[in-house]
């Protein structure tokens, strides 16, 4: 310590000015040479990763941290600029382009940089090894001749491991034989390989009609039932645009979706089909939504060749555009603009952000190309009808006037052309002009009192085990039904708009994992959702959809029901309806969904069949339902009161005032709300008693026809069925039943 202190006592500070002047003169020489004090891009600096402890979790979506020393940060006109103090902070010449600009990096180095910061959750299975193979191949640029003999020995292995070298074009890949696709449209080997790998051997009707027209450059307005493959109907032409484009950087497709979950689903689907493109550039197809770091998204957008296809929600994309004029200029050159679930995007209250995006891009495109609008526009949805957006409770079904079916799409198109800048009149492709709900969906109805909705949900999932998706109009109903089913020992999960996006995705993953386990055990798995999951989401294996409440509009009913019977599979949609709903809203819904405008009489009222209900089984479930409902109400009321009290205390502490309990009674609404919740609470002894009683009932087997005598008596030997595991898994004496088979057989008998 003494030498250091002595050095300080000698005041060596002023002496350091001499080397400072020398370094200043040297820096002037470097400035003259164009090598120092230049504004550098963040990607040109030697960032070092910071290890994040595993005990800290994922920071709620935090992907990683990097740091750098010896770099000055300057803010000029609101923009952050980096200035390196010395050349050691810059990337080595091997990582930079051989030229004058240190910001531009060569394509190989850029891709190494991309993979360095990539989130491991985004990497598909088997992709890491493929990327490492690609990196080693790029390092040995001159080794093609030495390894040619080995490659000739196995052409198939060469196709798999070396196809992504830049010496080989994507179109040179071997195309699989898919005559159903190639006989009707001209597709590249890249797309054909993706279709073959995913098992899409035949195009759907909407794909068959849309893709050739889109490849020819037409604007398209496409309508098809849910689960019919609309994503690939617009996705394949966009992927073909990337392959045929020579610039290797210009954006090709811009796709907008109404929800974040749908945007991620579309992105994953396009990446699977265009796997060869993604392997060549992992960020050629990007998803830009809220709930994720906007700084990381801005950074990824700067990589060379990134964001050739962007799937985005309007809010986040608008935020990115308005922060950076270069992004506006860049995406103004886009070839194709797509609106998925266009009817939802263009409804009142959802169009403002999209309209601002169009204004930004239109102005930039007009300035650069001298044209106001020049991109190809494609819009798709399962519902294009002005009647669908009317509230079912607003107008009487008797006063409704339905336009002729041949003019319906024309009427909607006139409405859309006032909002969307088409180049001309788009082609209308309607694969189901008379059919609103997919033909694979068998609809059914349960009539009950409003207070018995929970009971009949329990009855349905008990009698028909499988994967069931229940839709509610209110978030409170979602929470209550979730607690109710948990009390009945049924695997239930919830998803609604009040949940964080991270928790929504976790809930979906847990539901799918539990569904696989319960399928082997023949037990029910239930996902309870608000309308956040109604549009576009492709949740695999949904067998039944239950409308806990009648939807507020017909388009919501169509999209809810479309979560089952995906990709030509079959499914069941059940509506639980109270007498009040049956009088008006249900009749209006059936009238809107009628097949033809000129249908005679009132046959449309009888199109939906009643689900057969067995009263003896319902009577055995009623007491269980009452106890589970009371416990669920108590749990939710207790949790809600605790949150209200904590919020009030926190607000009072922030304001520096005392909380007076009498203040709550002065507000009539708060007082009534609190009283209502207090009335639902159960004391500890009552709650414990209810739980014990409920557990005793759950341990008592349910018997068909309430049989409690000898198992070996009667027409069927129940003991033999139990030992051989015949019959229903939860109800003794009941045959295995399937809701779809039951409704099919009932419809056949009705036709006879």
Curated annotation (Swiss-Prot):
The gene is MAK5. Residues 454-609 form the Helicase C-terminal domain. It comes from Eremothecium gossypii (strain ATCC 10895 / CBS 109.51 / FGSC 9923 / NRRL Y-1056). GO terms for biological process: maturation of 5.8S rRNA from tricistronic rRNA transcript (SSU-rRNA, 5.8S rRNA, LSU-rRNA); maturation of LSU-rRNA from tricistronic rRNA transcript (SSU-rRNA, 5.8S rRNA, LSU-rRNA). InterPro entries: DEAD/DEAH_box_helicase_dom (IPR011545), DEAD_box_RNA_helicase (IPR050079), Helicase_ATP-bd (IPR014001), Helicase_C-like (IPR001650), P-loop_NTPase (IPR027417), RNA-helicase_DEAD-box_CS (IPR000629), RNA_helicase_DEAD_Q_motif (IPR014014). A motif (Q motif) lies at residues 180-208. ATP binds at residues 224-231. ATP-binding RNA helicase involved in the biogenesis of 60S ribosomal subunits and is required for the normal formation of 25S and 5.8S rRNAs. SMART domains: DEXDc, HELICc. One of its GO terms (molecular function) is ATP hydrolysis activity. This is ATP-dependent RNA helicase MAK5. GO terms for cellular component: nucleolus.
């Amino acid at each position: 310590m003494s030498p250091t202190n002595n050095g300080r006592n000698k005041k060596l500070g002023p002496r350091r000015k001499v080397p400072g002047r020398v370094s200043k003169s040297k820096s002037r020489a470097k400035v003259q040479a164009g090598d120092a004090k230049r504004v550098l891009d963040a990607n040109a600096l030697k960032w070092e990763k910071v290890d994040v402890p595993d005990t800290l979790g994922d920071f709620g979506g935090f992907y990683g941290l990097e740091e750098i020393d010896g770099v000055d940060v300057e803010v000029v006109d609101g923009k952050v600029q980096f200035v390196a103090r010395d050349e050691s902070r810059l990337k080595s010449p091997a990582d930079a382009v051989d030229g004058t600009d240190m910001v531009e990096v060569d394509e190989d180095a850029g891709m190494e940089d991309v993979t360095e910061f990539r989130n491991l959750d985004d990497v598909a299975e088997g992709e890491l090894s493929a990327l490492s193979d690609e990196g080693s191949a790029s390092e040995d640029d001159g080794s093609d001749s030495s390894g040619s003999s080995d490659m000739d020995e196995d052409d198939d292995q060469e196709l798999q491991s070396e196809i992504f070298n830049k010496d080989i074009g994507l179109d040179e890949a071997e195309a699989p034989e898919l005559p159903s696709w190639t006989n009707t449209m001209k597709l590249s080997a890249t797309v054909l390989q993706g279709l073959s790998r995913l098992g899409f051997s035949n195009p759907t009707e909407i794909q068959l009609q849309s893709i050739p027209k889109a490849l020819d450059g037409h604007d398209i307005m496409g309508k098809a039932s849910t689960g019919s493959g609309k994503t690939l109907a617009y996705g394949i032409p966009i992927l073909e645009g990337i392959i045929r484009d020579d610039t290797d950087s210009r954006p090709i497709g811009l796709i907008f979706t109404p929800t974040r979950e749908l945007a991620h689903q579309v992105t994953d689907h396009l990446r699977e089909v265009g796997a060869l493109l993604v392997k060549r550039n992992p960020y050629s197809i990007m998803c830009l939504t809220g709930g994720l770091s906007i700084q990381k998204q801005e950074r990824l957008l700067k990589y060379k060749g990134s964001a050739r296809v962007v799937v985005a929600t309007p809010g986040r994309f608008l935020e990115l555009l308005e922060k950076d004029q270069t992004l506006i200029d860049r995406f103004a050159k886009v070839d194709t603009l797509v609106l998925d679930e266009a009817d939802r995007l263009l409804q009142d209250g959802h169009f403002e952000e999209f309209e601002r995006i169009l204004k930004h891009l239109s102005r930039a495109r007009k300035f650069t190309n001298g044209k106001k609008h020049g991109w190809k526009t494609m819009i798709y949805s399962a519902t294009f009808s002005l009647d669908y957006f009317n509230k079912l409770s607003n107008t009487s079904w008797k006063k409704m006037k339905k336009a002729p079916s041949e003019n319906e799409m024309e009427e909607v198109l006139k409405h859309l052309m006032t909002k969307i800048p088409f180049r001309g009149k788009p082609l209308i492709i309607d694969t189901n002009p008379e059919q609103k709900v997919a033909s694979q969906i068998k609809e059914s109805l349960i009539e009950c009192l409003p207070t018995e909705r929970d009971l009949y949900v329990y009855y349905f999932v008990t009698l028909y085990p499988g994967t069931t998706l229940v839709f509610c109009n209110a978030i409170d109903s979602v929470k209550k039904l979730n607690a109710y089913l948990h009390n009945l020992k049924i695997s239930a999960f919830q998803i609604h708009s009040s949940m964080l996006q991270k928790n929504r995705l976790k809930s979906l993953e847990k539901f799918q994992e539990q569904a696989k386990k319960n399928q082997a055990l023949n037990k029910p798995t239930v996902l309870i959702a608000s309308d956040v999951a109604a549009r576009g989401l492709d949740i695999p294996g949904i067998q039944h959809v239950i409308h806990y409440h009648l939807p507020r509009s017909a388009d919501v009913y169509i999209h809810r029901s479309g979560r089952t019977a995906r990709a030509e599979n079959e499914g069941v949609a059940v509506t639980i309806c109270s007498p009040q709903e049956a009088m008006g809203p249900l009749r209006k819904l059936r009238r809107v969904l009628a097949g033809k405008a000129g249908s005679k009489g009132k046959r449309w009222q009888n199109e939906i069949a009643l689900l057969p209900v067995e009263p003896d089984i319902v009577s055995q479930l009623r007491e269980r339902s009452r106890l589970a409902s009371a416990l669920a109400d108590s749990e939710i009321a207790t949790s809600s009161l605790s949150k209200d009290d904590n919020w009030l205390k926190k607000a009072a502490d922030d304001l520096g005032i005392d909380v007076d309990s009498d203040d709550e009674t002065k507000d009539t609404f708060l007082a009534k709300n609190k009283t209502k919740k207090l009335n639902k609470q159960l004391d500890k002894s009552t709650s414990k008693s209810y739980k014990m009683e409920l557990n005793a009932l759950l341990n008592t087997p349910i018997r068909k026809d309430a049989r409690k005598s000898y198992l070996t008596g009667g027409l069927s030997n129940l003991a033999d069925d139990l030992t051989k595991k015949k019959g229903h898994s939860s109800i003794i004496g009941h045959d295995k039943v399937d809701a779809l088979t039951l409704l099919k057989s009932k419809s056949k008998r009705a036709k006879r």
